[in-house]
Each structure stands twice: as C-alpha cells, then as structure tokens.
Amino acid sequence: THLVLPAKNDSKLVAAASKSSFAKLLDAGIHIHEFHGGLLHSKTLTIDRNLALIGSANLDRRSLDLNFELNMLVYDTEFASELRFLQSSYIEQSTSVDAGTVSSWSIQKRLWQNAIGLISPIL
C-alpha cells in the first residue's frame, strides 16, 4: 500500500498533523511518498485492478458534513488502470519517506507534529 502526499503543503498545520502519523503508518507497512510536482488535493484509491475511488473528500466529519465533499466509486478495469498509471507517475515524482527519515527528525519537530496531531480533527 502506498500513500502519496504533497512534499509542500499549503498549510503548515495540516502538514504537521499528517507527519504525526508517519511512524505508525510505516510500522503498518505503508509506503509513504512525498510528491514534488505540486499540491495534491484529490484522493485516489485503486483496488484489484478494476475498482477505483476518486474525489476530494477526506474521510472525516469536516469533509463529509461541513464541506460537502464527495468521492466517486468506479467499477471499471480501464478507468482503474488509467488511475493506477497516474498514481505511478506521482510516485515517480516523489521522495520516499522511511523509518530512518522519521527517526532523524529532532525532538522539537516531533513534539510540534504530535501536538498538532492532537487537534487534527478540527483542521
């Protein structure tokens, strides 16, 4: 499983909140990539080469209830293949984040990220 996030976020708080989960995600076997080609807002997921989820909504109350964002589930092999190709291109334009990278962050940086992570539900 791969997670692609923008290397530069338009919000320092959102970036810190995201990074507060990196160690747990890496421990769970998730491959994290920081995309250098610009800001990514779309959320995409491909499953079993024939199912695709695409949209703008985060899976949180704010996106679903307040912002009225949507995702679309598509059962189509060709669509899923094209989306998978796009996802691969994002990974090619990214830098991988590994456990060594996360453990090299300073105590101050990790404290900041974890403190912001506590308020992530309201960001």
Where are the regions that the model predicts?
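PLD/PLD-like phosphodiesterase catalytic module centered on the HKD motif
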Residues: 1-123
